[in-house]
Each structure stands twice: as structure tokens, then as C-alpha cells.
Regions:
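Alpha-helical membrane insertion/targeting regions
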Residues: 1-264
Length: 264
């Protein structure tokens, strides 16, 4: 088995696993926008969740229907479609379904991007609303000096949202143009998936951070401590995005050089 086959297979399993995780996250636990299940209403689950992040960070979208409809719930459909879209056999066996699902997929991407705009307009960023005992840009990272660099963490979030939208545009254009370039379409679709699923990996890194603090400083050291929860949340977003992007580029590197960055 070649390195490229191994890379793509691991990538596919990773994408599928993270997609399932996010579907469960959105609809069941914590399910803040879900009409069928709200795990945060369970006292035991809420205590466990609050040890990692403040309750408001998880629940704040519950009172913002437009954000739920435009951003959160479409993300679950986006995750449901993604594994089918990137499965080689599915693409070959069901080309019409692949084309139709692809149009829906990129429409969902556009909706999610608009949902991020709503989040920004309503100032629902975690560093703005979820840690009232800390200043907006205080303790945004355990080690990155955003303020000394003249930056706010919102710039990181804007960059991530812009890249998500840009990769979707490139992926769609590569397949929809008259001179279709399916290798470029594949590369940009994977970059788009990495841009979106960095959010799922963030959840993993949050847990890893707290586990590391447990091992280094004693059980529960960082649990429920805003001064640690906030930078852990911010750094985990950066790490999740970086790991997803780097692994994606490794996979894309196995495509022919002439098609990796072309859009048509």
C-alpha cells in the first residue's frame, strides 16, 4: 500500500469520525440549537461540561434563532454530506447524486459563512461574551501574545471564516467551470473540509489540554478556572485548524503538482 493511499484512507476515516462527532454534538450533546435533545438541561452533563468551558459558551446560540438556522444546524447537514462526497467509490457509482449533493454542500457552506457574519454582528465571540471576569482580549492564549502583536483573537476567527469561504468558492469553481478540473476540485474540497473540521478538532484539543493539566498539576487543576479555560479554548481552535490544514496539505501533496493550486 503506497503512502498516498494510506494518507487518503486515514484522512477519510478522520473526516468521517469528526463529522459524526459534530452531528452528535449539534443534535444531542450539548445540542444547544437542537429541537429534539438538550443535554445541557441534565445537571450531571452540565457539570461535566462546565468543567471544560463556561455554560454560556455552549448555550448562547439557543437564544439566537437566526444563528442556529443559518450556521449551527446547517453544519450538521454539511457534516452528513461530506463523507459521501469524498468517497471515491460513491463518486464513481453515483455521479448524479454526487453532483446534486455537491450543490447542496456548497450552499450549506455559504449559509454557514453567513451564520458566522451573524455571530460577529451580534458579538457572540467567546472572548467577548463567555468570560465576564476577563477583559475581551485578556488571556486569549496560553502563549501567543496577541495584544503585544497588535491583534485580537477575532482576527484569527475572521481569517478562519474567510479561508472556509474561499476554499468553498475554489472547490465549486473548479467543478462548475466550462474547463472542469476535477483534481483541483478534489484538492480544494479537502482544504474546505479541513477548514470546517478544524472546529471539530478544537473539541479534541480542549479535552487534551485539560488532561495535560490534570497530569502535570493534579486532577481538576484547570477545570472551571476561567483564566485557563479561555486560553485553552482559543489555543485549541488554533491547533485544530493547523493540524487539519497540515494533514490536508500532506494528502493534497500526492496530487500532481500542476493541479494542486489551479482552480480551472
Amino acid at each position: 500500500m503506497t503512502s498516498s493511499v494510506v494518507a487518503w484512507r486515514i484522512g477519510y476515516v478522520g473526516v468521517s469520525t469528526l463529522c459524526v462527532m459534530m452531528i452528535l454534538w449539534i443534535w444531542f450533546a450539548p445540542g444547544s440549537c437542537s429541537p429534539i435533545s438538550r443535554a445541557m438541561d441534565d445537571a450531571r452533563f452540565r457539570r461535566a461540561s462546565e468543567a471544560l468551558v463556561p455554560a454560556n459558551l455552549v448555550l448562547k446560540y439557543r437564544d439566537h434563532l437566526a444563528v442556529c438556522v443559518a450556521h449551527v444546524l446547517p453544519a450538521s447537514a454539511w457534516c452528513a454530506i461530506a463523507p459521501f462526497q469524498i468517497h471515491p467509490s460513491a463518486r464513481k457509482r453515483f455521479p448524479r447524486a454526487h453532483r446534486i449533493a455537491g450543490r447542496v454542500f456548497f450552499a450549506l457552506s455559504a449559509s454557514m459563512t453567513y451564520g458566522y457574519v451573524l455571530i460577529h454582528r451580534r458579538d457572540l465571540h467567546f472572548h467577548a461574551t463567555d468570560f465576564p471576569t476577563l477583559a475581551r482580549d485578556e488571556r486569549a492564549s496560553l502563549w501567543i501574545p496577541y495584544r503585544r502583536l497588535g491583534l485580537s483573537f477575532v482576527h484569527v476567527e475572521h481569517a478562519g471564516a474567510a479561508w472556509f469561504a474561499y476554499t468553498a468558492t475554489r472547490a465549486f469553481a473548479a467543478a462548475a467551470s466550462s474547463t472542469r478540473n476535477f483534481a483541483a476540485h478534489r484538492a480544494w474540497t479537502w482544504r474546505h473540509l479541513a477548514a470546517g473540521l478544524g472546529i471539530a478538532l478544537q473539541r479534541v484539543f480542549i479535552w487534551v489540554h485539560h488532561l495535560c493539566f490534570d497530569l502535570a498539576r493534579g486532577s481538576g487543576y484547570s477545570r472551571g478556572v476561567a483564566e485557563l479555560q479561555k486560553p485553552i479554548f482559543g489555543d485549541s481552535l488554533v491547533y485544530g485548524g493547523a493540524v487539519a490544514a497540515l494533514y490536508c496539505e500532506w494528502c493534497v501533496s500526492f496530487l500532481t503538482p500542476a493541479t494542486k493550486w489551479k482552480s480551472s
